[in-house]
Amino acid sequence: AAPSKATVGESGIITPGGRLIQLPHGVSIILEGPSAALLSNGDFVTYESS
């Protein structure tokens, strides 16, 4: 079974559904919630529904 929350590291995110998202150089996660993450460059990553 897939984990119920994202795994977040310095260089990327593994979403609850198993999707790997690599962060651009110098970009970090400034806010993480149960369904998305806000990045320091203003972008956001929406996690897929489980």
UniProtKB/Swiss-Prot annotation:
Residue ranges of coiled coil: none
Sequence repeat intervals: 6-23, 30-47
UniProt-recorded name of the protein: Cuticle protein CP498
Taxonomic lineage from the root: Eukaryota, Metazoa, Ecdysozoa, Arthropoda, Crustacea
Tissue: Calcified shell.
Sorted UniProt keywords: Cuticle, Repeat
Domain of life: Eukaryota
GO molecular function per UniProt: structural constituent of cuticle
